[in-house]
A protein has these predicted regions:
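Small-molecule kinase domains that catalyze NTP-dependent phosphoryl transfer to phosphate-bearing small molecules
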Residues: 127-173
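ATP-dependent small-molecule kinase phosphotransfer cores
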Residues: 33-96
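Hydrophobic positions on the alpha1 helix immediately C-terminal to the Walker A/P-loop
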Residues: 18
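Post-Walker A helix-loop "phosphate-sensing" segment adjacent to the P-loop in P-loop NTPases
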Residues: 24-31
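ATP-dependent NMP and nucleoside kinases share a basic, alpha-helical "lid"
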Residues: 85-128
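P-loop (Walker A) phosphate-binding loop of NTP-binding proteins
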Residues: 10
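Conserved glycine(s) of the Walker
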Residues: 14
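Hydrophobic anchor at the beta1->P-loop junction of P-loop NTPases
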Residues: 7
């Protein structure tokens, strides 16, 4: 049986870093939401948007692109899949919660929520010049993390999959889930 896990968390919390560590121990397919959107835009012969344009653009339209690209990638592999994405987007007009139907369409076994100290997240975001992200202080990030955590837990319950909190970059929790 193929394992499908969504690893969610704020931008800059370390999702891709944690998945990189997981890949040192377990063979998986790592599907990033932004890469899936760009791949689907290319597949449909649309101009690919920058990561910043994806964040502030038509967030809900992008979810359909994610679902289509994810399903195509999932059909092509028997390996465990880790979906690296967000359930709450810090968009142009504030926080946008991604509806449960998007995660249901990914046929997930578990939703993992990666949390970290908001001060640390703020520092990571400032040091990462490769991505355009909104500048947020630790207090704001703490509130965003609380909202995203609650939404992830609610989505997992709504779609009937396991909810796992991963704190402090604990790769062993993911290894256990991937099995």
């Amino acid at each position: 049986m193929r394992v499908r896990i969504a690893l969610l968390g704020l931008s800059g919390v370390g999702k891709s870093t944690l998945i990189g560590r997981l890949r040192q121990s377990v063979q998986i397919v790592h599907l990033q939401a932004s890469a899936l959107i760009k791949a689907e835009q290319a597949y449909r012969a649309q101009d690919a948007d920058s990561s910043e344009a994806l964040r502030i653009g038509a967030v809900m339209d992008n979810q359909d692109l994610i679902i289509a690209a994810y399903r195509r990638e999932a059909q092509a592999t028997a390996l465990p899949i880790i979906f690296d994405g967000h359930n709450v987007i810090d968009g142009r007009d504030g926080l946008v919660e991604i509806p449960a139907y998007v995660f249901r369409a990914l046929d997930l076994d578990a939703i993992c929520y990666l949390s970290a100290d908001p001060e640390w997240i703020a520092e990571r975001r400032q040091m990462d010049a490769s991505r355009a992200r909104p500048v947020r202080d630790a207090v704001t990030l703490a509130e965003h993390q609380r909202i995203a955590y609650s939404a992830a837990e609610r989505i997992a319950e709504e779609i009937g999959c396991r909810f796992v909190v991963i704190a402090d970059d604990k790769v062993d929790q993911l290894i256990e889930l991937v099995g």
